[in-house]
Amino acid sequence: MVYLSARTLALVACVLPQLTQASGLDTAAVAIGKVYFGTATDNPELTDTAYVKQLSNTDDFGQITPGNSQKWDATEPSQNSFTFTNGDVVAHLAEGNGQKLRCHNLVWHNQLPNWVTSGSWTNETLLAAMKNHITNVVTHYKGQCYAWDVVNEALNEDGTYRDSIFYQTIGEAYIPIAFKTAAAADPTVKLYYNDYNIEYAGAKATGAQRIVKLIQSYGAKIDGVGLQSHFIVGSTPSQSAQASNMAAFTALGVDVAITELDIRMTLPSTDALLAQQKTDYHSTVAACVQTARCVGVTIWDWTDKYSWVPSTFSGQGAACPWDENFQKKPAYDGILSALGGSASATSTSTAGQSASTTSTSGSGGSTAVAQHWGQCGGQGWTGATSCATGYICTFVNDWYSQCL
């Protein structure tokens, strides 16, 4: 018979639960009652087999959003001539993986084909074209989408309506009419208004609340508000500010979702910036966790290799939780800890270190001490209950406490 020393047993007790408790982002999100954790994708990167392998990892991603292939220019490039080829590729991938499809988007001032932006419209003719577009696209994807972003970015920064072709020609009524049309085409899909810079209190968030009330006043269905959440490292709203803002929306009787999360930084990245990014991701996801009617989080692609940020914001990037080489960044563990999961064993940060033991007895005995991010308590837990210097054993749920 082989006898193990007390030190060895203590080490096993610390490390083994770390391994068994480890979980991916979607697994952790669903475990605490969220509907999903997901990511956007786009067709060009679907030729990258290593990328698709991780995209299809349902432990991390339970939902996919097509970044561009369901927008107006992609689906109706010529009037009443519809093409769904690229959108179907993403939809079929999600279906094959058992992932939810969050569909995006139906009415937006951007990425419109020339026949829309340059048309000579009246209220009646543009309404007919808009309703025809919505009806055809939603009908094609009926039963495949968990939710649709029906109207996207209808507001200026001061909360007034954006002067789009739809607002110029139809007025604010185009918004509730779009929602009514989408609901008629697929009565079961969830319908969202989606925008950026509405993640914190201010004129634009107030404008988005006005849109919710407008849609409701027309008797139209609106299920939720999408908070895009394109943030900047070090300037991300606090957890409390985001949670308070979410509460202002849910008080109107709708859900919220974080729909396009990324947190960019000025390049090159540094350890300090990556650490702050981890904190910012944590606070954002924690706000959703704190909010019962925040149904889930979608990141705006998962790897820096295919992020939209560098081509849009000069000198900025590194906005995603995985780097260009598909390695997890500290941000990943920031997200996972906010969701109540244990730290990643493969993160490029030091946060995934397993628990160790430290001898504190002059007689040769040992006391287990969990390192940063290690488990330190929970129902049935028999391992270390003390944390390394500088960290506190923090309650996460009845089954899990963590050194934070």
Swiss-Prot record:
It catalyses: Endohydrolysis of (1->4)-beta-D-xylosidic linkages in xylans. Divalent cations such as Ca(2+), Zn(2+), Mg(2+), Cu(2+), Co(2+), or Ni(2+) at a high concentration (5 mM) slightly decrease the catalytic activity. Fe(3+) shows strong repression. EDTA and SDS also inhibit the activity. Optimum temperature is 75 degrees Celsius. PANTHER family: ENDO-1,4-BETA-XYLANASE, GLYCOSYL HYDROLASE. Its EC number is 3.2.1.8. It is found in: Secreted. The lineage of its organism: Eukaryota, Fungi, Dikarya, Ascomycota, Pezizomycotina. Glycans are attached at N123. Optimum pH is 5.5. Pathway: Glycan degradation; xylan degradation. Endo-1,4-beta-xylanase involved in the hydrolysis of xylan, a major structural heterogeneous polysaccharide found in plant biomass representing the second most abundant polysaccharide in the biosphere, after cellulose. Efficiently hydrolyzes different xylans including beechwood xylan, birchwood xylan, or oat spelt xylanand; as well as xylo-oligosaccharides (XOS) except xylobiose. The main hydrolytic product is xylobiose, followed by xylotriose and unidentified longer XOS. A small amount of xylose appears with extended hydrolysis time. GO terms for molecular function: cellulose binding; endo-1,4-beta-xylanase activity. Residues 1-22 form the signal peptide. Its main location: secreted. This is Endo-1,4-beta-xylanase 1. GO terms for cellular component: extracellular region. Keywords: Carbohydrate metabolism, Glycoprotein, Glycosidase, Hydrolase, Polysaccharide degradation, Secreted, Signal, Xylan degradation. The active site is at E153 (proton donor), E260 (nucleophile).
